[in-house]
UniProtKB/Swiss-Prot annotation:
InterPro entries: TatA/B/E, TatA/E. Belongs to the TatA/E family. It is found in: Cell membrane. It comes from Corynebacterium efficiens (strain DSM 44549 / YS-314 / AJ 12310 / JCM 11189 / NBRC 100395). This is Sec-independent protein translocase protein TatA.
Length: 103
C-alpha cells in the first residue's frame, strides 16, 4: 500500500492547518538541531568505546590506611537520666473544655 500524490498533499495540508505555517520552520529547525546534537553524542560515545580506559595507578609510596581500633573505655549514654532531668511539660488537655460538648 503506497501513498499517492493526493494522499501526501492532504497529509501536508493537515499538518499546516494543525501546527500553523509560522511554527513549522521553527519546529523543523529545532528538530534539525536535535538530530545534530544526537549524532555528535553518538559519535562521541563510539569514540569513548574505542579507547580503552586506562587503569588508575597508585602513586609511589602510597600505603593503604591501617585499621583503627575503637577505644575500649567509652561509656554508653544514659538516656533515662537525661529525660529525668528534663522539666515536666504542663498537660494543657486537662484544663481544656470542649465548647461543642453536650452535658
Amino acid at each position: 500500500m503506497s501513498l499517492g500524490p493526493w494522499e501526501i498533499a492532504i497529509i501536508v495540508l493537515l499538518i499546516i492547518v494543525l501546527f500553523g505555517a509560522k511554527k513549522l520552520p521553527d519546529a523543523a529547525r529545532s528538530i534539525g538541531r536535535s538530530m545534530r546534537i544526537f549524532k555528535s553524542e553518538v559519535k562521541e560515545m563510539q569514540k569513548d568505546d574505542e579507547t580503552p580506559a586506562q587503569p588508575e595507578q597508585q602513586p609511589q609510596g602510597y600505603q593503604h590506611p591501617q585499621q583503627i581500633e575503637a577505644p575500649q573505655n567509652l561509656q554508653q549514654p544514659n538516656f533515662q537520666q537525661h529525660y529525668q532531668n528534663q522539666p515536666q511539660q504542663p498537660d494543657y488537655r486537662q484544663n481544656y473544655e470542649d465548647p461543642n460538648r453536650t452535658p
